Amino acid sequence: MVKNKIVGIIPARFKSSRFPGKPLADIHGKPMIWHVYQRATKAKLLDEIYVATDDQRIKEVCDSFNMQVIMTSDTHTTGSDRLSECASRINADFYVNIQGDEPMIDPDSIDSVTQEILIEENENIVASGAFMPINDPSDIIDSNVVKVIISNSGVAISYSRSPIPYPKDGKAHYYKQLGLYAFKKEGLDIFAKNTP
C-alpha cells in the first residue's frame, strides 16, 4: 500500500485589517507564526509543513527559525486561495489548511480533521473541516467568530459571521468553525475553479 503524502499549509498575511502584522506578534519571545508551526509539527499525520505568505517580513522570520516557507501571490482574499496556489506548486495527496493565528492549535485536532478525509468509506468527501460547540454566549454575536450550521449527520451546511441558526424556540445549539480544513487534491481543484 502506497502512503499518502499529507502537507500542512499555514497561510499567513501581514496586512490583516483587524490586526496588521499578527503573524509576527510576540508571544513569550517568539512570533505567533512560530508557535503555530511548532504545534503543527506535533501532528502525527503531516509529512511536511509550510508557511504560505505574500510578505517578505514573514518569510524572513520563518527563514530565521528554519521553518519551511513558500511565497505566494498578494492577490489572495482567503487562506484557502493561498492554499490552492501552494497545492499547484507542492505535490501531495492531501493538504491541511491550518490557521496562522491559532498559537494554541491542538495537534490532535489537526490529525482528527485529516483522519476524516483519509477514511476509505469517505471516498466521496473532498474536504473535511473542524468545528466545536460555542460555550461563551458572547461568541454567538461576535462577528469575528464564524458560526456553522451542522446537519444531523455532522456535515457543515452553512457558515456565517451572524448568529445562526436563529433560535426560534430559544434552544438553538451554536457551533463555531475552527478554521482547520483538510482537502483532497481534487477538492482543492474544485475549490479553485469555483472561487469568484
Where is each model-derived feature located?
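Hydrophobic/aromatic residues located in beta-strands of well-ordered beta-sheets
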Residues: 8, 49-51, 95, 128, ...
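Residue-level signal for inorganic ion chemistry
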Residues: 33, 101, 184
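Conserved core of the sugar-phosphate nucleotidyltransferase
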Residues: 105-195
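Short, high-confidence coil segments that cap the C-terminus of an alpha-helix
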Residues: 46, 92, 122-125
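Short phosphate-binding loop-to-helix
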Residues: 50, 56-115
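N-terminal glycine-rich phosphate-binding loop and ensuing alpha1 helix
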Residues: 4-52
